[in-house]
Amino acid sequence: MAPKARLVAYKTNWNVQCPTFKTIGSNEIDVMAAFEAAIDDGVDVINYSQASNNSAYLDDGTGIATFHAMKNGILTIAGAGNSGPNAGTAANNYPWVLSVGASTIDRVFSAHGTRFYDFVSKVDVPSELYPLITGADARISGANVSDASLCQGGSIDVTKVTGKILVCRNAGRIVAKDETLASVVARDAGAVGMIFVYEEKIGDGFTLSQFHAVNTIVLSYKDGETLFSYINSTRTPTASISGVTNTLGVKPSPIMGSFSSRGPNQNNPGILKPDVTAPGVDILAACPPEIFQSSYCMKTGTSMATPHVAGIAALIKKVHPDWSTAAIKSAIMTTASPLDNDGMPIRDSNKTSDATPFAYGSGHVKPNMAMDPGLVYDMNQYDYLNFICAYPPESTTLKEFSQQHSYKCPRSFNILDFNYPSISIVNFTGNAIVTRKLKNVGPPGTYVPRIEPPPGVSIMVEPKTLVFSQKDQIIVFKLILTADINHLSTDYIFGSLVWSDAKHVVRSPIIVKAKNK
């Protein structure tokens, strides 16, 4: 994304964990130390490919550390997590952080129509036919059939597998190490390759791409059922693993990764999370060769999507060094697109249903458009402090987040007036007024609104047009939402607001949830 950027890495994960462990995969004190070191070093952007602990929120080291970074003009871009597709799993839900979901790119590595990953470049791809054997059929005497089906260590008979392609199932979960460990078992058993099949409950639209110790094909549940049907139809099943085919311009794309964590925001549903989605499936990454036996490997996860957006933020910072972290965040969010390369709504991981903003946030990032967004929803640390003030006990919380312990909270705080680039209205009673401020960061222009209201909701905007006569001018507008609450869906419903001057498109998703009757 930003090939001329200089990188510095700070270690947060250690083998020893403190009793006050609150952040997934590391000790929060180490996370805070890393952030403070980065702040002291004067970095411009922080990439945080790690999920925070949702239960802590404003009482954890990540929230405090990222807030300190924001105060020093440093935007943190963080992964939304890999706990999808379940609802309410999005992590790093702090409003001063840009959280990122993961979706596919328009490139597919395939072998005879199936997903293929050849990560160990030193191993020659076997092009001839080899016998196929399932883990269950290859189990060692006394081993559990289920363990052998998963190709778990100690369950496979080497004498049955040597010189064959081993077929393994996953454990009904999306865990990268399942693939890796199974491939190690296959290698140690003398297999020439492995076919790894995902279970039905994970869905048919996603397979992980991780390090494999042998040449591996990864199949979805549907393709796996076809394979098992073939194996059961003959006494001598055979297969070959062909060379990889790199296909570009794949449509439709992007498609959401099913692993990508989803909203609604469990900490505060009035803030939509994740904020955007970015490429995070089958991403070519540099890997430590002493671990992965190669300097490069294909990786999948929101940890891959996050640095894409961090690079975009670094480019914006270079072009607009005077912009606040909120302005950079707004530029990325309001120029993101909810459409795929067919001009249709981004699809969810099952490839048939449309994804929602709980999967992709404001949409898939558009780097070039983000450099010139036209308008931004700007904020400063005091806006975020007012947000924190809504969480009791305010005195203790404020002390953790700011050195300005004497900061006086406002008497009231209405999240509908919080100048966030996306708009979320929960506990909607049939009437609501949303206030936002837009700052002109482009040339003078007149912006007109285009509204797609959520089903059953009427929306009026005041004023009808926004006329900007100069740069940095700020104009306040209101959205007035009305609905017959008795005939409104009790589920979350979605719409959008677009301000445009015919050149710039400033888009905000709208999320409405009616109050329980």
How would you name each of these model-derived features?
Residues 1-517:
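Loop-rich non-cytosolic ectodomains and luminal regions
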